[in-house]
């Protein structure tokens, strides 16, 4: 595979991640795209403790999808360089589930985020995530 083909494949993997894992809620897609050795930074309640592997990521995903069952993530931009791929996203959803430590507020939220991932052999092996969860919680009046 040429370098250009690898970059395009990595961009496709990132787009597929947000479409299948978040928009469609396909849990099995997590295991298809994320290495069990993957280190996920920026998603844990304890910033110093990354979520490890698909099994470590799954509780975060489950809680978030329970709170926002119809979440919509729009990938605005995707950039790839070397073994890394970056996505700039807009997130929208209605807080309809009792999860994330609170009762459903039925409030609409919208916030933005950036995800950077390192890809090896077509799988995510490390990610750095910066989503504006403070804005999300403010919209939930928490």
Regions found by a protein language model. Give the residues of each.
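C-terminal and inter-domain tail/linker signature
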Residues: 1-142
């Amino acid at each position: 595979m040429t370098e250009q083909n690898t970059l395009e494949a990595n961009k496709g993997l990132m787009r597929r991640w947000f479409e299948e894992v978040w928009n469609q809620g396909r849990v099995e897609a997590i295991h298809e795209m994320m290495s069990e050795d993957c280190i996920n930074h920026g998603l844990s309640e304890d910033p110093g403790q990354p979520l490890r592997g698909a099994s470590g990521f799954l509780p975060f995903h489950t809680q978030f999808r329970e709170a926002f069952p119809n979440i919509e993530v729009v990938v605005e931009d995707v950039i790839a360089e070397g073994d890394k791929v970056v996505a700039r996203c807009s997130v929208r959803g209605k807080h309809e589930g009792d999860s994330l430590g609170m009762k459903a507020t039925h409030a609409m939220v919208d916030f933005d985020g950036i995800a950077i991932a390192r890809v090896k052999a077509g799988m995510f092996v490390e990610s750095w995530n910066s989503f504006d969860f403070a804005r999300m919680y403010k919209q939930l009046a928490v």
